[in-house]
Amino acid sequence: LQSKSSLSDFENFIPANEDIQPNERVTDNVNSDLKRQMQMSLAAFSGGICSAADLFTRGYDTHNDHDSLHASLFSHLTDSIDFFWTSAETAGLADRITMLIGSDFGRTPNYNSDMGKDHWPIGSFIVMESSPSWGNRVVGATDEGHNAYAINPSTLLRDDDSGTNIYPAHFHKAF
């Protein structure tokens, strides 16, 4: 914030009520305001009162009926990400944003007896920017059992002898 007036000026960046994104029904048990969170984050970025935002969505803890639940959840997520980048471009912010997408845990590689997937310590993060020079790249790998291989933190290549596993804390520290 440049001054106290920056906060009062923020109201100029908040969308009109009729333009605020509504809640969306994603599954029988999940209503999402993710697009509204994105919209308000972009308003805060535009208003100069915010440089980072931590957004969330729910419903991914699928201990039963995993595939059918994840299909609608991921469809909503990708639609929301597209909404975010389109809105960021319109606001003139896209070239200054780095988006991290991740979870606090992954899902087991195999189904349980309820066709769900339980908690698993191996997951993934997605790092996105508008036009990165480093895009279309995967860092890290797992074996057929979905166990992480160690990587060299300098080269980002697999290194079984002296590498390390990548943890969410590595992403948070880097950004």
Label for each model-derived stretch:
Residues 1-175:
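Ligand-binding pockets and gating/stacking loops
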